[in-house]
């Protein structure tokens, strides 16, 4: 019997399921055993400016030649790797996963740092809206209440908060690391299925562009979080308060003026 191949759509975005019986799987009584394997996503159109050898580079037309191992296959590849961190395929795969995960945490974190302060400036009452001061409210006399509502979530116990963090984050990380808790074909970075209820990944070309947008915004968010940490250490204020101070007096409230405060003898 001639071998046949059938492609079926998978519930996970960017994946296809290949049913490919080999000659050894076809028995004499005509019974066929199907084997499920993960197929690669459809290649991105050569017209995309973010992929392939002609993609946008880190210095535009002055970038020079990219390393041979940076082929433009993955989102966010601008052909720059002076430290050679991507030369080893296994190391590159690990670093790529870590970057995407940290990008997502940074985007959530940056929003979480700015949004409460924004609400507080518009009349919403918080015990403490500045992100690096909020946690210490649990030691205050009134304790810590979510959104100012003492009955919403009981947050007076540090041990209870710690336990919730361990259980909730541990469950998510366990799901991600295990990869296939339900025996399904899963991409740990872009699982699709239930994680894509809006169907944003149904069009391969649109999905490829969304990956680029995610990694670009994630990298900006990581730099933002670094800036928030530095601001907290130097000024002791939240990001929006620092922005307001800078707009009110840009000459005396900027990175250079704060940096010169640490010059010996000043």
Swiss-Prot record:
Disulfide bonds: none
Binding site for chlorophyll b 3: 157, 173
UniProt GO MF annotations: chlorophyll binding; metal ion binding
Modified residues (N2-acetylarginine): 35
Binding residue positions for chlorophyll b 2: 104, 153, 182
Top-level taxon of the source organism: Eukaryota
BP-aspect Gene Ontology terms: photosynthesis, light harvesting
PTM field: Photoregulated by reversible phosphorylation of its threonine residues.
Membrane topology: Multi-pass membrane protein
Entry's localization field: Plastid, Chloroplast thylakoid membrane
Binding site for chlorophyll a 5: 213, 231
Annotated residues for binding of chlorophyll a 6: 246, 255
Transmembrane segment boundaries: 100-120, 152-172, 220-240
Transit peptide feature range: 1-34
Residues where chlorophyll b 5 binds: 165, 262
Modified residue annotations for Phosphothreonine: 37
Residues annotated to bind chlorophyll b 4: 165, 176
GO cellular component: chloroplast thylakoid membrane; photosystem I; photosystem II
Binding site for chlorophyll a 2: 102
The family this protein is said to belong to: Belongs to the light-harvesting chlorophyll a/b-binding (LHC) protein family.
Role played: The light-harvesting complex (LHC) functions as a light receptor, it captures and delivers excitation energy to photosystems with which it is closely associated.
Binding partners and assembly: The LHC complex consists of chlorophyll a-b binding proteins.
Protein name: Chlorophyll a-b binding protein E, chloroplastic
Organism: Nicotiana plumbaginifolia
